Amino acid sequence: MRGDKATIPDIELEELVLPANLISDESLSPDATAEEEFCPYRIDSKCHNCGCRIRVTVAATEFGIRCFEQLLLKELCLFCPACSRQLPRNGRS
């Protein structure tokens, strides 16, 4: 606008472009949902009972393998096949 008073030629209107969700509270769905892939992981550890080497191969997502890692570091122990046959299962022989 130029001058003291607004006249029709002085008013410039431009089209305002807004995303659809701002106008009607709709959410835009993502084009492709990224699903995590299951990848193979090889875990080398030691038997909790006799100390022999154990290798376990699993397929997991990145989140899954990180959770499994935390379990192995804090609350979960692995046994070799020989030791697992000698241990009682859930209080049974």
Curated annotation (Swiss-Prot):
<dbReference type="GO" id="GO:0052170">
    <property type="term" value="P:symbiont-mediated suppression of host innate immune response"/>
</dbReference>
<protein>
    <recommendedName>
        <fullName>Protein E7</fullName>
    </recommendedName>
</protein>
<keyword id="KW-0863">Zinc-finger</keyword>
<keyword id="KW-0238">DNA-binding</keyword>
<dbReference type="GO" id="GO:0039502">
    <property type="term" value="P:symbiont-mediated suppression of host type I interferon-mediated signaling pathway"/>
</dbReference>
<dbReference type="GO" id="GO:0003700">
    <property type="term" value="F:DNA-binding transcription factor activity"/>
</dbReference>
<keyword id="KW-1078">G1/S host cell cycle checkpoint dysregulation by virus</keyword>
<dbReference type="GO" id="GO:0039645">
    <property type="term" value="P:symbiont-mediated perturbation of host cell cycle G1/S transition checkpoint"/>
</dbReference>
<keyword id="KW-0899">Viral immunoevasion</keyword>
<keyword id="KW-0922">Interferon antiviral system evasion</keyword>
<keyword id="KW-0945">Host-virus interaction</keyword>
<dbReference type="GO" id="GO:0019904">
    <property type="term" value="F:protein domain specific binding"/>
</dbReference>
<dbReference type="GO" id="GO:0030430">
    <property type="term" value="C:host cell cytoplasm"/>
</dbReference>
<keyword id="KW-0479">Metal-binding</keyword>
<feature type="region of interest" description="E7 terminal domain">
    <location>
        <begin position="1"/>
        <end position="39"/>
    </location>
</feature>
<dbReference type="Pfam" id="PF00527">
    <property type="entry name" value="E7"/>
</dbReference>
<comment type="similarity">
    <text>Belongs to the papillomaviridae E7 protein family.</text>
</comment>
<feature type="short sequence motif" description="Nuclear export signal">
    <location>
        <begin position="65"/>
        <end position="73"/>
    </location>
</feature>
<keyword id="KW-1114">Inhibition of host interferon signaling pathway by virus</keyword>
<keyword id="KW-1048">Host nucleus</keyword>
<dbReference type="GO" id="GO:0042025">
    <property type="term" value="C:host cell nucleus"/>
</dbReference>
<feature type="zinc finger region">
    <location>
        <begin position="47"/>
        <end position="83"/>
    </location>
</feature>
<comment type="subunit">
    <text>Homodimer. Homooligomer. Interacts with host RB1; this interaction induces dissociation of RB1-E2F1 complex thereby disrupting RB1 activity. Interacts with host EP300; this interaction represses EP300 transcriptional activity. Interacts with protein E2; this interaction inhibits E7 oncogenic activity. Interacts with host TMEM173/STING; this interaction impairs the ability of TMEM173/STING to sense cytosolic DNA and promote the production of type I interferon (IFN-alpha and IFN-beta).</text>
</comment>
<dbReference type="InterPro" id="IPR000148">
    <property type="entry name" value="Papilloma_E7"/>
</dbReference>
<dbReference type="GO" id="GO:0003677">
    <property type="term" value="F:DNA binding"/>
</dbReference>
<keyword id="KW-0244">Early protein</keyword>
<keyword id="KW-0010">Activator</keyword>
<keyword id="KW-0553">Oncogene</keyword>
<keyword id="KW-0804">Transcription</keyword>
<keyword id="KW-0805">Transcription regulation</keyword>
<comment type="function">
    <text>Plays a role in viral genome replication by driving entry of quiescent cells into the cell cycle. Stimulation of progression from G1 to S phase allows the virus to efficiently use the cellular DNA replicating machinery to achieve viral genome replication. E7 protein has both transforming and trans-activating activities. Induces the disassembly of the E2F1 transcription factor from RB1, with subsequent transcriptional activation of E2F1-regulated S-phase genes. Interferes with host histone deacetylation mediated by HDAC1 and HDAC2, leading to transcription activation.</text>
</comment>
<keyword id="KW-1035">Host cytoplasm</keyword>
<keyword id="KW-0862">Zinc</keyword>
<dbReference type="GO" id="GO:0006351">
    <property type="term" value="P:DNA-templated transcription"/>
</dbReference>
<keyword id="KW-1090">Inhibition of host innate immune response by virus</keyword>
<keyword id="KW-1121">Modulation of host cell cycle by virus</keyword>
<dbReference type="GO" id="GO:0008270">
    <property type="term" value="F:zinc ion binding"/>
</dbReference>
